[in-house]
């Protein structure tokens, strides 16, 4: 026996046998692969070019159909996803708006709280605190402001009261409409035109009460006239001042004359009505036109000779002018 068989032991496999088995399996695999390759080559040799071309066309058609089906499926998915995406974006926007509003309200509440704290701090720790009476004057306003800040802030209404800033200092005295005293206006008022003393329409009574003022006016007019006739005084003043004084004298004289004439006319009408209504139970009052005629008659009777002649000349000229206008050569 050879050396190889002598060294074999029962129930034990040597390492050389394992190696040989592996080599044999590898050789078998290679043989099978070679056989398959030879068979495929033989089959390709038997195929014609026309059949190969048809097979290529079939493969291309299948690929195109598969691509189209995939593109359609993707398009439908996109169309389905678009409205969902829009809905999601709208929801996100709404949520963002709600969060912003909540944050804005929280900030406003925080600002109001800080302002109220500052107000209380300024009132309690100010350098110059107002007196107790002044503080009581504003108790109601401070309570109202605290209640308003405690509630949730709503939108400003049309007829809401005006809001003043907390940075401005509060005045010790509040301005009340109707009780404002304007310093520009004079405090002293004329009693004649005060409603508390009676109706201002009753001019006759006012004239009777203050008739003594005419004497003072006459004295002032006489003094100004004497000053204007004084040469020494005129040499000291300018021409402008002289003209102003002359205008003032004329103005005062015209006012005094108008007041005196009105008083005289009222007296004439009153006396005439008293004579008419002596024996009448029902009093008769004259019209304005009748009053004018009565006044003119009285004035004409109490005029001097020269004044009457002047009045008659004026009336004669008026009458002639009216008659002259009525001629035919004026009616063209």
Swiss-Prot record:
GO terms for cellular component: 90S preribosome; nucleolus. Residues 73-100, 321-332 have a biased composition (Basic and acidic residues). This is rRNA biogenesis protein RRP36. GO terms for biological process: maturation of SSU-rRNA from tricistronic rRNA transcript (SSU-rRNA, 5.8S rRNA, LSU-rRNA). Residues 150-159 have a biased composition (Basic residues). Residues 1-184, 305-332 are annotated as: Disordered. Residues 236-283 form a coiled coil. Keywords: Coiled coil, Nucleus, Ribonucleoprotein, Ribosome biogenesis, rRNA processing. Residues 124-144 have a biased composition (Acidic residues). The keyword Amino-acid biosynthesis does not apply. Component of the 90S pre-ribosome involved in the maturation of rRNAs. Required for early cleavages of the pre-RNAs in the 40S ribosomal subunit maturation pathway. Belongs to the RRP36 family. Pfam families: RRP36. Associates with 90S and pre-40S pre-ribosomal particles. It is found in: Nucleus, Nucleolus.
């Amino acid at each position: 026996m050879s050396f190889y068989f002598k060294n074999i032991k029962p129930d034990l496999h040597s390492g050389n046998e394992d190696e040989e088995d592996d080599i044999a399996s590898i050789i078998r695999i290679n043989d099978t692969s070679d056989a398959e390759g030879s068979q495929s080559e033989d089959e390709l040799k038997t195929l014609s070019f026309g059949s190969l071309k048809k097979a290529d066309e079939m493969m291309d058609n299948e690929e195109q159909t598969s691509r189209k089906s995939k593109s359609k499926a993707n398009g439908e998915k996109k169309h389905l996803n678009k409205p969902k995406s829009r809905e999601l974006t709208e929801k996100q926007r709404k949520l963002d708006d709600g969060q912003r509003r909540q944050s804005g309200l929280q900030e406003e509440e925080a600002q109001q709280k800080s302002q109220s704290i500052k107000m209380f701090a300024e009132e309690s720790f100010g350098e110059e605190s107002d007196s107790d009476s002044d503080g009581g004057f504003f108790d109601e306003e401070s309570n109202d402001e605290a209640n308003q800040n405690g509630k949730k802030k709503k939108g400003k209404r049309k007829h809401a009261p005006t809001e003043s800033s907390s940075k401005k200092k509060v005045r010790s005295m509040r301005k009340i409409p109707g009780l404002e005293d304007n310093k520009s206006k004079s405090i002293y008022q004329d009693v004649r035109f005060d409603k508390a003393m009676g109706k201002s329409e009753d001019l006759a009574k006012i004239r009777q009460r203050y008739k003594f003022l005419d004497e003072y006016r006459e004295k002032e007019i006489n003094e100004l006239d004497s000053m204007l006739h004084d040469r020494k005084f005129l040499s000291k003043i300018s021409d402008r001042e002289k003209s102003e004084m002359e205008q003032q004298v004329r103005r005062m004289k015209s006012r005094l004359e108008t007041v005196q004439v009105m008083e005289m006319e009222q007296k004439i009408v009153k006396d005439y009505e008293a004579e008419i209504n002596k024996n009448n139970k029902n009093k008769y009052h004259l019209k304005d036109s009748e009053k004018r005629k009565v006044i003119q008659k009285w004035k004409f009777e109490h005029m001097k000779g020269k004044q009457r002649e002047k009045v008659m000349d004026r009336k004669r000229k008026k009458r002639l002018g009216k008659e002259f206008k009525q001629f035919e050569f004026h009616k063209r």
